[in-house]
Each structure stands twice: as C-alpha cells, then as structure tokens.
Amino acid sequence: SSNEKNNEIDWLVNPVSEKAMVYKSADNNDIILSNGLLKRTFRIQPNLVCTDFKNMSNGQQLLRAIKPEAEITIDGNSYNIGGLYGQIENGYIRPEWVNKFVAHDSDFHFLSYEVNDLKPFLDRKLNIWPMKQQHPTGKDIAFNFSSSLATLDSIFVTVHYELHDGIPLIVKWVSVKNNSTHVITVGKLVNEQLALVEEESAVVGTPEQMKKQHGIYLETNYAFNNAMRYDISDQTTHWLTDSVYTSQVNYNYQTPCLLKVYPEKVTGVELQPGDIFKSVRTHELLMDSYDRERRGLVIRKMYRAVAPWTMENPIFMHLVSRNDDEVINAINQCSATGYEALILSFGSHCNMEDSSAENIAKWRKLADYAHSKGILIGGYSLFSSRRISDEDDVIDPITGKPDAAAFFGNAPCMGSKWGLAYLATLKAFISKTGFDIFENDGPYPGDVCASTKHPGHKDLYDSQWKQMELQKSLYHWCNEHGVYVNAPDWYFLDGTNKIAIGYREVNFSLPRENQKILNRQNIYDGLWEKTPSMSWGFVPLTRYQGGGPEAVLEPLSEHLKDYKQLMMQYYGAGVQACYRGPRLYDTDSTRKVVSETIAWYKKYREILNADIIHLRRADGRDWDGIMHVNPHGKTKALLMLYNPLKEKITRTIKLPLYYSGITGTALIREQEAAAKSYKLNRGYEVELTFTIAAESYTWFVVE
C-alpha cells in the first residue's frame, strides 16, 4: 500500500532518469536489456536463450527455467527459434548451470543482432492536439536466426524486442523472411514463451483454479469480442502446464506456469518468395503490486506511451440528420458552444458507402463548411452484424453455410469481394470528402471463414489472420492520415482512438434519474484500465430505442438541470459522451448552459484528461466520487463529488493524494472559492469535509 511507499521515488509519480540500453556482459556471453525498471538477459552461445527477467522496482525474478525464444511451424513441421538444453531442475535457475547447456542442431540458430533507436509503430502526426503527446522513445533490438537444415536454407527468422524508456515495458514480436524461390506455409507461430515462476502452489488443483503469475501483464494487438475490456477480448495468451517442471508442488503437474502467446485459429498462412510475415506484437508490462488502482495506473501509463493517439479527445456531437440543412445547423451550434467535432451518427443521412460523384461532392461541401468553422466532421459505417450475400458472408466450417456461426448472427467476410471493395470505398470517401473522423461499428469480431473462393484469403486456416490484417490495415491508414477512429472493439494498439466505456444500451431508455447514477457507475467501472479519453459514454437528447419523456432531454430548455448534470458527470470524468440528437440547444438559455460547461471543461482539460483514482462507487445511498491526479501539472488533482439523496449532506472523507505527487501540504478549494491549506498524513491523505445540496454535485481543485 502507499503507506510504506515514498512517492518521491515512485516511477509512476516521478519519472526515472535511466534510459533504455542494450549492452554486452564483460565476458561477451550475454546481452542485457535494461531501463532501470526492468532487466532482461540473454545468453547468446551456443544458441540464444533468455536466462533472466527481473522487475527492478521490487526485485522480483520472473523466470524459473529457460525455454526457446519462439516456436514456428513451417510446412507442417515445428521448429524452435533459439533455445538451450540441459536444465534438470526447473524450479529455479543457477547462473553457473547455463555454461553447461547445449544447443540442438535442428533449432534455428542465433546469427547476429542489431540495436536501433525505437521507432513508432504507427507514424501518426502528433501534437496537433491540446494535450501534450510524444512518440515513444527507447531501444529496439533484433536477434537474427537461420537454420542449418537444407529445407529451411533461405528462411530467416528475426526476434524483435522494443524496450521503452520510463516504463517497465518490453514489446516482443517475430518476423519470418522467405528468401527461397518457393511458397512456404507458416502455421502456428508462438512469438513468446516464458517458464514463469508460479504465482501460487497447491498439491491438488487445476490450471483454471490456480492463480496466474501477477508480476507480468500481457497485451497483444490481436483482440476482439465486444467486451470493451482487453483481458476478456484477449485471443493470444495461453497459461499452460509444464511437465518437465518435476519439482512443482502440484501432484499432477497442473500448475499454470508456462506462458505461450499465439493466435489459436491461425494455422496456415502462405508466405510468397521475398515476403515477410510479421507476428502479433506482445506488450509485456511488469507489475509490482496487487493493488487494483496501481495496476490500472500502470496499464493506463502503457497506453499513453505506446498508443499516444489515445490521448486525443475531441468534444463531439452525435448528429441524427435527415438533410443537409440540419448538418449546417449542427455545425453552427458546435461552433457557437465550443464543440470541436460533429459525427453523423447511425440513422443519419450520410452514407459513406455511396461512392457516386454526387454523394462525394455533397459531403465534400459540408466538410469544407465544417472546416471553415473550425469543426471536425465524421461519419458512421457498420461492418459486422449485417448480411451481404451468400457469396460474400462468412462460411461456417462445420455446416458449410453462410452466417451459421457468425459472432453477431450475420457477417460479411473482410476477405470477400465485397469486403475488399468496402475497405477501398471507405478510404476513397474519407480521402475525397476530407472527413476527419470515422466511426466504425461492428469492427471485425474474429469470425473465421471456410470459403476457398474469397480473393482476400485462401481458406479456413488463414481466414482469421487475413481478415484481421485487412481490418488493421484500415485503422493503420486512418491513423497515419490523421483520421480519428471510434470503434467498439479493442483495436487501440493498431490505431483506433476510442471504445465504448461499457454500458447497456437499453439503459438510455430509462428515466434520467436512473441514467445519472448508472452513468456514474459506468464511468467508475470503465476507467480502471482505460484513460478517460479512451472511452465514450452516451446521452440521448432524443428518444433512443425506447422510453418516454422521462428518459429524454428534449425539449432541452425544459430539462436544463439534468442536461447540465449529465454533461458535468461525463466532462468531469474527462469522458466524451455521444450527445445524440438533432441539436445541442433550443433556446439562448440552453446555449449558455452548454457553452459554460464546455468552457469549464476546456479550462481544466489537462487535469480532467488525467487518470482517475476511484473514491466511492455510486450506489444511490450516499455520496460517490472520483478524483483525477496529475503529478506533472500545475493542478495536481480535481475531485468530482455527487449527492444522489433527496436531502443535503455533509461528509468528511480521507482523500488519497499519493499519486498527485504532493508530499507535504495541499491547497484545496471548492470550485472557484479561496483555497485552504491541508497537511498530508504519513499515508499521503488529508481529511476533507464537504457539503452537497440534495440531488446535486460539487467539485474541488487540489494544487
């Protein structure tokens, strides 16, 4: 807990001065990767293997045994990439054992290595945004391997590590180059395998029942399933048992202590002569705590480092338009209130799949008008959960029928003729109209396809991989062309900007009173691993799916108190909601309320976009609240506090200021009142007393 910690030497509060470096050991036998927060050591002869993986913050050693660097199946045969043999005791490694280990002739052998400065994975133009972003810095090391087997004569494998500055993070991926004159088939490719120290022991227990190693968090850019959470969307992390670890406590050798990373359904991808196959990219983040908030802060720090585009957070309206005049009116309203962007929502009259000259010209003109007012403009398109045709939809491998096993009931195949044309049409529409934002509903959800006639994939065995690559290629293109992407699935590491915070859609048909509390619960629950800018919420200005007048805000001027509070809840959390309807205001008094709220948000934007500390979840019985913290800003913290009760309340709470970076005294003010001085106790807390009117809220600034 923070009680024993000193926030002045905590890398999450004060950045470390050490930079990523790669160096050889004195005896030239080892290559060491280190950045002050983690250290990873490789023995490079007689073959290459990782012998040491250590968290420098708490001294934890993660490895109990050595394993090959990677595994690859080529033309049906499996090969190890690197690897040494001879370890008998697999519960720990003694450094002197490593000198006696031997290589196997049939493995890919280590040839050479290169070290470079880290280059960004996607070349997005940063710093067009009010919040400071930067491309990641660090070192990139490539270990090159080849095989002595005649059949693999011209096949080269490279294992890549990217070590980041200032965060205990290493990214690992593998590339395969086919320098031969014939096609090869790449089957299962395991890009990472680690014999990890077990998290716990049990004499009897299954891998499912036993905890997995907590000192490492893994995230790979191959995730989908509509959960709005990475851990449930993950498709590549496999916690396996290790039968050669004979000294483990578990009687049946069932301890989950062998980690392998690979996409399960990718078993046969053709690699043409001269081409390079690149594996998934696995982010390995070392954890020094069980504390949920701290673990979440580390993950949020990772997104800011590796996917800085997730920090962009334009203030947008979700317009449901029937004609061009409504678009022009909405652009004018955005401009008048300080909004920054307009998205033509689902159900509006913008069809991004209509590539006719007439449609392009119409939207180009509207985009030009938006840009003349300083407003970004975007459109909506649905990929999955729609039916196109028997020829173009995903074919179920079991029944051979279209759509029979689609995740959303129906789905086109991204590799079908229609799917390939869909991608080209979207790019052309965005390029020709000058649209700035793309809202992609139903992004590719992982459906396999058994068709052998689709031009974009060969058969079932490469269908998921090829569709994934096509979906990612669209997001890479958007990212590198500065197009902002909202997509409700986990494609952040491949260039998307925002995902749904995690809500039940029909709740927006409930009375506004329920929506207020449920929205605060969604914010609290949705921001453990995500930063505020990575999520969108929802505010139905007009009827959405169901509900009567008690559920909607129109006429806006008659519901100003609720409209303002719903805005303050989201903007106060740093979360952009989809304000869905035909207009942002109906009267001058409504316009003033919207403008004042946006002006407040822009004034405190830096702290409101900072990570949140969870204070108390909304339960409708007592106060609830969250607090943003930013140790690097002038404003160190900002609290949003709510009273859902029908009477005024006064409460005294302990405010945890550890992650604000404050050490001695905090200056705290309610809204724009005079600040009072508070001395922090040994646990970096202050006692704060506040009063909130019935069914209302307040906010405090900490400096």
Language-model regions: role of each:
Residues M317-I398, K417-A424, Q464-S473:
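Aromatic- and glycine-enriched glycan-recognition loops and surfaces
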Residues A307, N323, W363-D368, L376-F435, ...:
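Active-site-adjacent "subsite" loops/lids of carbohydrate-active enzymes
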Residues I31-G36, F53, L470-A675, T689-W699:
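Active-site-proximal substrate-binding groove within the catalytic cores of carbohydrate-active enzymes
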Residues N3-L33, L38, C50-C257, P263-T267, ...:
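Polysaccharide-binding surfaces and accessory modules of carbohydrate-active proteins
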Residues P95-D117, F121, K125, L285-V298, ...:
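Glycine-rich, aromatic-flanked loop segments that form ligand/cofactor-binding clefts
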Residues V269-M287, I692-V702:
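Short Pro-Gly-centered flexible turn/kink motifs
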Residues L37, V174, G274, C334, ...:
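Conserved, mostly hydrophobic/aromatic
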Residues E340-G347, L423-G456:
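Active-site groove signature of glycoside hydrolases
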